[in-house]
Amino acid sequence: MIHLYFLDCSPLLNEQELARALPQLDDHRQAKVQRLPLAEKKAQSAAVGLLLRHLFGNAEYAYNTNGKPCLADRNDVYFNVSHSGNYVVCAVSDREVGVDVEVGSAIRPAVMRRCFHPIEQVWIGEDSERFIRLWTMKEAYMKRIGSGLSLPPIDIHLSIPPTNGYDAPNACWWYLTQWETPVSLCSECEQLVEEHIVTIKDLL
């Protein structure tokens, strides 16, 4: 099963709320938040720290060669985090999992040429929702396998039009639109997805 957590981090745009959150973060996360120049990025990073603490307590983390985090002392729990705008999402599973959220992204011609096969480009056309759908699905796949951008997105071939379910060997996707912004999930196999709405109030 995949547990998917969806969090609105906008309350942390308030400096007083952010100040309340900081002491509950570990030293590394506090320093990271304080280094970030933009209020939006501070809120996102602090929210990630609060959510991970809520889910995993004071767990130790390790990182693969491309920077994907994992729990250092567990090989039966995997997670992946994404944030955009006011939203943070985290997917937790007993298998490798990738998740991506993207708020209001306009079509970017350079990204289209570099990341999408010509057939995908034709399907997207001028439709920004289709652009976001394919982009988040590709991102979720890259995050699942932990490749970063060492795997060119253009080499990830999706069915057109894309569908939920298996769309490549050892890759199963979900494209979820029931929240304020769409979220893509990718796992190596089909699983049940249990959704959880979390608030900053729950975490403080």
Give the location of each predicted region:
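Core catalytic alpha/beta fold that binds nucleotide/phospho-ligands
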Residues: 1-204
